[in-house]
């Protein structure tokens, strides 16, 4: 378990954690714990910003998103950008994967990144501390779900090959149940939180399924997209009302 946590934090954060092995099944299973730590960090920034800035200011949310980007090396948002560019191009899967590996950001990807960062920043500023934690954890639970059994890796993807199909269904179900239980306390209405995170996870699963059809399987970029889309939609759902 300690090795799995070390691998998860080495993969999902900038912390100089030594991992005895690369990213694999154990590290992916433990990834929601990384989300819990990152969510607590973002929530602390929002809480402190609430004291520092005027009521209703979006700056606490902006700073929280900035801290998350720094703490994750921008890994997930970069993957989201590449995935959007890949989905936005024409041609066979090989062409889409080549676009994703190119390293440069296209206009479609840049526009999508701006929207996602803006929505996260604005919603985080409106959420309770626990709701911020819940949204960030939801993004990491989505990665576990994306790597469930039967999901293939795209051709040539090193990370995809290491983690695709690695998560048993009971692990996926367990994390989703735990996330829904946490979300009960994230909003004044006890049903809103679970509904918000379940819808967000469902949308992420639909995105991953589309990527599997388009690319022939998942890649590390697709997992980054799952993180960002789920976090954004969960935060949006938790902020309603």
Swiss-Prot record:
Cofactor requirement: Mg(2+)
Superkingdom as given in the UniProt entry: Bacteria
Protein EC: 2.7.8.26
Keywords of the record: Cell membrane, Cobalamin biosynthesis, Magnesium, Membrane, Transferase, Transmembrane, Transmembrane helix
Recorded catalytic activity of this chain's protein: alpha-ribazole + adenosylcob(III)inamide-GDP = adenosylcob(III)alamin + GMP + H(+); alpha-ribazole 5'-phosphate + adenosylcob(III)inamide-GDP = adenosylcob(III)alamin 5'-phosphate + GMP + H(+)
Gene Ontology CC terms, in alphabetical order: plasma membrane
Tagged with keyword Magnesium: yes
GO molecular-function terms, A-Z: adenosylcobinamide-GDP ribazoletransferase activity; cobalamin 5'-phosphate synthase activity
Transmembrane segments: 33-53, 55-75, 105-125, 127-147, 168-188, 192-212, 220-240
GO biological process, one term: cobalamin biosynthetic process
Membrane topology recorded in Swiss-Prot or TrEMBL: Multi-pass membrane protein
Compartmental location: Cell membrane
Pathway noted in the entry: Cofactor biosynthesis; adenosylcobalamin biosynthesis; adenosylcobalamin from cob(II)yrinate a,c-diamide: step 7/7
EC main group: transferase
Chief location bin: membrane
UniProt record similarity statement: Belongs to the CobS family.
Function (record text): Joins adenosylcobinamide-GDP and alpha-ribazole to generate adenosylcobalamin (Ado-cobalamin). Also synthesizes adenosylcobalamin 5'-phosphate from adenosylcobinamide-GDP and alpha-ribazole 5'-phosphate.
PANTHER family in alphabetical order: ADENOSYLCOBINAMIDE-GDP RIBAZOLETRANSFERASE
HAMAP family: CobS
Stated name of the protein: Adenosylcobinamide-GDP ribazoletransferase
